[in-house]
Amino acid sequence: MGACAEYVCLPAQPEDGALAIKPTNMTYEEAAAVTMGGLEALSFVRQGNIQSGEKVLINGAGGAIGTFAVQLAKSFGAEVTAVDSGEKLDMLRSIGADHVIDYTQQDFTKRGRTYDFILDVVGKSSFAGSMRSLSPDGRYLLAVPGLSQKVRGRWASRTSNKKVTFGAAHPNSEDLLFLKKLIEEGKIRSVIDRCYPLEQTAEAHRYVETGQKAGHVIITVGHEGA
């Protein structure tokens, strides 16, 4: 997963790794995206213990993890607010976001709204502001926390009813099969921005580093076009 190689060694037994047969309604490129984004998103959304009808905000919703997190939260019955740059908002609506916020125009922590679960995929929102944006018993998950956020998060969890947790995904076949079922039911899908041939891997990385990608960038072997 995430390897720029023509071949990869996998465990002999499916239970020893994250292995599943490709969904019949997906291309190989779309299926590749599930393993790098879908599995992490599922782990984070489950850690959020989302209940049907709850309000969920996802910061960094337009990336590889975020696009799956939006769809998974919706499949769990949540009302989802997606935060990202303006050019990604239409895409986020198309995958089910109920509300969208352009972070270059609005700071979600200053809108006076509260959420039952906030998932920060990118780690760039204000910690104090995000805590204020939680409901009294809200949960806040940081996928890429810094040291200061870890210290403040642990303290906040001990001194209030609000809970702060940190991202830790452990891919396994059971989760991959769960995602496969949702895909085959048409409840979630991969969002692919561009495909690059293996020979243009460096160019693909440069594009990703611009921060402009929506969803996934895929490296292909035997490339047949973007």
Question: Where do the protein language model's features map onto the residues?
Answer:
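NAD(P)H dinucleotide-binding glycine-rich loop of Rossmann-like/cofactor-binding domains
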Residues: 1-60
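Rossmann-fold NAD(P)-dependent oxidoreductase module
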Residues: 68-72
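Glycine-rich phosphate-binding loop and adjacent beta-alpha segment
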Residues: 84, 122-188, 220-226
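C-terminal capping/lid region of NAD(P)-dependent oxidoreductase domains
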Residues: 187-191, 203-226
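Glycine-rich NAD(P) Rossmann-fold beta1-alpha1 loop
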Residues: 38-39, 60-67, 123
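Adenosine-nucleotide cofactor-binding segment
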Residues: 28, 55-58, 74-129
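Short, glycine/polar-rich helix-capping loops at beta-to-alpha or helix-loop-helix junctions
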Residues: 3-6, 85-93, 150-153
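Terminal peptide-recognition signature
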Residues: 8, 41, 73, 92, ...
